[in-house]
Amino acid sequence: VEWTDFERATIKDIFSKLEYDVVGPATLARCLVVYPWTQRYFAKFGNLYTATAIAENAMVSKHGITILHGLDRAVKNMDDIKNTYAELSVLHSEKLHVDPDNFKLLADCLTIVVAARFGSAFTGEVQAAFEKFMAVVVSSLGRQYH
């Protein structure tokens, strides 16, 4: 993947401004509410029966934060995201048996949460850079499935 200077700067800027303890939980909670079939991967998290229960679930919050910290690795290794996520791809495919389509759903939820946080600063150009980055992440996480 070729990154422009604008794309690199935009991705680094977005992640430097994200409040991981807010955005991570909000993203995973949104995914679990909007796409309830994704809850099957989180059965050990306990009560996921309502949007309120999901939003207040400490394990959802913790894992949402973990996901964002995982994205830090991609931000720091934009030229080699596929290899950066090789082990994570194996984990999700072979051990956790996560449907790779769910990575795209989570990426879409993150885009919505980030757009809401950034407001008018999340211009079309910024969104294009962010979605390109997330598409590479999603592809890399799904790599083991192919």
Swiss-Prot record:
SUPFAM superfamilies in alphabetical order: Globin-like (SSF46458)
A GO cellular component entry from the record: blood microparticle
Domain spans labelled Globin: 2-146
Highest taxon listed in the record's lineage: Eukaryota
Record's keyword terms, sorted: Heme, Iron, Metal-binding, Oxygen transport, Transport
Listed GO biological process terms: hydrogen peroxide catabolic process
Residues that coordinate or bind heme b: 63, 92
Expression by tissue: Red blood cells.
Function as written in the Swiss-Prot or TrEMBL entry: Involved in oxygen transport from gills to the various peripheral tissues.
Binding partners and assembly: Heterotetramer of two alpha chains and two beta chains.
Note: This fish has five hemoglobins: Hb C, Hb O, Hb 1, Hb 2 and Hb 3. Hb 0 presents the strongest Bohr effect while Hb 1 presents the weakest Bohr effect.
Name of protein: Hemoglobin subunit beta-0
Source organism of the structure: Pagothenia borchgrevinki (Bald rockcod)
Species lineage: Eukaryota, Metazoa, Chordata, Craniata, Vertebrata
